[in-house]
Amino acid sequence: DIQKSKDGTIKFLLELKDKRNVETVLIPDKSQSRYTICLSVSVGCYLSCEFCATAQISKKLVRNLTPGEIISQIILCKDYIDDWSTQKKITNQVLMGEGSPFLNLDNVKVAIDNSKNKDGLEYGRTRITVSTVGVGIKKDNIDAIEWAAKELDVYLAWSLHSSIPKHRSEIMPINEKYSINSLIPQLKKYYEKTKLPIFIEWICL
């Protein structure tokens, strides 16, 4: 299923092999020739952020997407706009669709590695942004955000949405487990390692 808005945004509802569905979105710039693709990384999500469309559909993680399923979203959308032979190009990726990338780190890493590979899709590190609510899990005995600085080495966007702990917990229950103050040192390490600015995501409620 494909939906188009007046501003040129294109939303795809994609069916996977197991008949599950995920969404992918192409967001155009003003010229309508350059697109940012918004990728999903899982079917469902248990984080239950109040403002998230996924949380309105499912408050549980059904399954993570494989690296191939993540990359296939890019290839399908490239085919749709004929990225390969026309002036229209998907120039940027944001992993901000369905699911939390930091809860599917192994598969996200493989997908990003293939995206950056010179024999693959050839996206530079500053053309890819990974979003995180700030899941403070451990990966290979270090904090996941610190691990991602080395293994992903792309832009990081922190899904903050409120700097008031009580309010953030109300709209993002994960804040009860991984507080703002506990995540700031990890985010500083990410910047120190990558020298890439960290984006702050903030929804107007």
Show where each model-derived region lies.
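Short linear Ser/Thr-Pro motifs
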Residues: S5, S40-V41, S131, S159
